[in-house]
Regions:
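Conserved helicase/translocase motor-coupling segment
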Residues: 1-30
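Conserved SF2 helicase motif VI
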Residues: 116-138, 145
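Conserved helix-turn-beta segment of the N-terminal RecA-like "Helicase ATP-binding" lobe
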Residues: 30-38
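Short, solvent-exposed loop/turn segments at secondary-structure junctions
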Residues: 11, 18-23, 34, 66-68, ...
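A short beta-strand element within the Helicase C-terminal
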Residues: 101-113, 144-147
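Phosphate/pyrophosphate-binding and catalytic-coupling "lid/hinge/switch" segments at subdomain interfaces
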Residues: 141-153
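A short acidic (Asp/Glu
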Residues: 23-31, 100-105, 119-124
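Conserved helicase ATPase core of P-loop NTP-dependent helicases/translocases
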Residues: 41-94
Length: 153
């Protein structure tokens, strides 16, 4: 479902999780299996080549305290020009919840609820900034927010 939403999105997507190994890494593996690759990185991908898709769909960027992502500062400094890059997915943990401005992003996915809703509002606010969508046509100046929850049963 998350991957379907990413592929249907008409612009870049921000995915937030409080968990690295139980939240972001499984998403990264799914992205690499489906044709996404790390942004301008010479680092080893997370997946072995035999499991990766050969169809290129875009790049992803990770901002986390424990996962290293090359060129994160280069990408973030592009500001309004972010929409001209091949980055389709930006993944982040709490380190990306404050002090980060994402321009032209069309979707926010919050993978798990947080007991403090102000953190969730901070995450959503990374993509909804003053004039952050000014370079887009008027009909594309919106942000869809997905809040996921899990149930037992």
């Amino acid at each position: 479902m998350i991957l379907d939403n990413i592929e249907k999105s008409d612009g870049p997507v921000f995915i937030f999780s409080s968990y690295v190994w139980g939240g972001l890494v499984p998403i990264i593996l799914a992205l690499e299996m489906n044709g996404y690759r790390p942004y301008k990185s010479n680092n080893e991908p997370y997946l072995n080549n035999k499991y990766k898709s050969s169809d290129y769909k875009g790049d992803y960027v990770v901002k986390s305290g424990s996962l290293k992502s090359a060129h994160i500062n280069t990408y973030v400094s592009k500001k309004q020009n972010m929409v001209n890059e091949n980055v389709k997915v930006f993944l982040g943990t709490e380190t990306a919840a404050e002090g980060l401005n994402l321009y032209g992003y069309r979707e926010v996915h919050v993978l798990e609820p947080h007991f403090n809703f102000s953190l969730t509002e901070q995450v959503i606010g990374r993509c909804i900034r003053n004039e952050s969508h000014i370079s887009l046509p008027i009909h594309k100046r919106n942000v869809a927010v997905y809040l996921y929850a899990s149930t037992i049963g």
